């Protein structure tokens, strides 16, 4: 520990701990969980599970990301994209990260058990284990299919939100999980393409490094086609109506256009734009689910 670390202000220390929770990723996950809460009921979500579920899921997600930062601190230090993280820079010790994660995780479990229900607590804990242990420790350093297999834990937020309100997870909730599960590979492979040297330097077996750029571009296109089909399921199942359908078709068509361009004429700039659009895509798609849900409630559909 050097003099710079010792002289840090409380504000900078707080920001370092917040950075461990990967706030932007956490926000998207919690957003999808909250959408799951609202889709689970035709009326307003009761305040207790809404607030308790949101806070509990947020805390456990932050705990999982903190463990991820701890495990990957040496890897992160080798990558331009992640070398700024306080864990990679050695600004927070291993013991501090473990304690921080344990506190967040413990508070999250207590919050979910107390203000939501035991099922949500156990499902969220399983998601924590899936991401922090199975994906981070076992899959990511071992196989280029890490994103495909490990994406199951990252796809769980809508089911967690649904369970927080109703105490069970019906088929409609699993459709939402499936959407995120299929969305995950093209989202991350676009990132892996334009950051492939980063991943190569870190020794991670991401698809562009193990199977080549062309193979990855093809699979981004294939998964985006599958995603387009999967996003029709809420309408086909009757969970959503024409408002959602129109949004899904428009958003999906644009995603397909990006994937097709990547397949035909690749550039790092295009991959970067595709990655960024994929985040906007998922956010707007789930927002469309919510708008459609309450539009149908208002008209009595």
Swiss-Prot record:
* Membrane topology, record value: Multi-pass membrane protein
Which pathway does UniProt place it in? Answer: Porphyrin-containing compound metabolism; heme O biosynthesis; heme O from protoheme: step 1/1
- Residues annotated as transmembrane: 25-45, 47-67, 97-117, 119-139, 147-167, 173-193, 235-255, 279-299
Catalysed reactions, semicolon-separated: heme b + (2E,6E)-farnesyl diphosphate + H2O = Fe(II)-heme o + diphosphate
Q: Name one cellular component (GO) term.
A: plasma membrane
Could you say which EC number(s) this protein's record lists? Answer: 2.5.1.141
The GO terms this record gives for MF are: protoheme IX farnesyltransferase activity
Keyword annotations for this protein, in alphabetical order, are: Cell inner membrane, Cell membrane, Heme biosynthesis, Membrane, Transferase, Transmembrane, Transmembrane helix
**Which Pfam family, giving just one, matches this sequence?**
UbiA
Q: Where in the cell is it found?
A: Cell inner membrane
Please indicate which superkingdom the organism of origin belongs to: Bacteria
Q: What miscellaneous comment appears in this entry?
A: Carbon 2 of the heme B porphyrin ring is defined according to the Fischer nomenclature.
Which HAMAP family does the entry link to?
CyoE_CtaB
User: What family name appears in the similarity comment?
Assistant: Belongs to the UbiA prenyltransferase family. Protoheme IX farnesyltransferase subfamily.
Q: What does this protein do?
A: Converts heme B (protoheme IX) to heme O by substitution of the vinyl group on carbon 2 of heme B porphyrin ring with a hydroxyethyl farnesyl side group.
Which PANTHER family does this entry report, sorted A to Z? 4-HYDROXYBENZOATE SOLANESYLTRANSFERASE, PROTOHEME IX FARNESYLTRANSFERASE, MITOCHONDRIAL
This one is known as: Protoheme IX farnesyltransferase
């Amino acid at each position: 520990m050097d003099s710079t670390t010792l002289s840090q202000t409380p504000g900078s220390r707080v920001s370092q701990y917040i950075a461990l929770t990967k706030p932007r990723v956490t926000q998207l996950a919690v957003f999808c969980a909250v959408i799951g809460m609202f889709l689970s009921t035709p009326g307003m979500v009761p305040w207790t599970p809404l607030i308790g579920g949101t806070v509990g899921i947020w805390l456990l997600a932050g705990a999982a990301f903190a463990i991820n930062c701890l495990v990957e601190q040496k890897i992160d230090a080798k990558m331009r994209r992640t070398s700024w993280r306080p864990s990679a820079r050695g600004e927070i010790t291993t013991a501090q990260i473990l304690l921080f994660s344990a506190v967040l995780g413990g508070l999250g479990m207590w919050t979910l058990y107390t203000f939501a229900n035991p099922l949500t607590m156990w499902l969220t804990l399983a998601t924590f284990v899936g991401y922090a242990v199975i994906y981070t420790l076992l899959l990511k350093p071992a196989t280029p299919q890490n994103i495909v297999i490990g994406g199951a834990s990252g796809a769980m937020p809508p089911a967690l939100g649904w369970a927080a309100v109703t105490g069970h997870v019906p088929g409609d909730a699993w459709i939402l999980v499936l959407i995120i599960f299929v969305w995950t590979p093209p989202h991350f492979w676009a990132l892996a393409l334009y950051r492939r040297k980063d991943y190569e330097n870190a020794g991670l077996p991401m698809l562009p490094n193990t199977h080549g750029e062309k193979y990855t571009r093809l699979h981004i296109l294939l998964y985006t086609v599958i995603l387009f089909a999967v996003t029709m399921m809420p309408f086909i199942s009757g969970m959503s109506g024409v408002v959602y359908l129109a949004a899904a078709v428009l958003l999906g068509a644009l995603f397909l256009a990006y994937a097709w361009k990547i397949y035909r004429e690749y550039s790092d700039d295009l991959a970067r734009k595709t990655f960024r659009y994929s985040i906007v895509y998922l956010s707007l798609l789930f927002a469309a689910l919510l708008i459609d849900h309450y539009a149908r409630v208002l008209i009595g559909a």
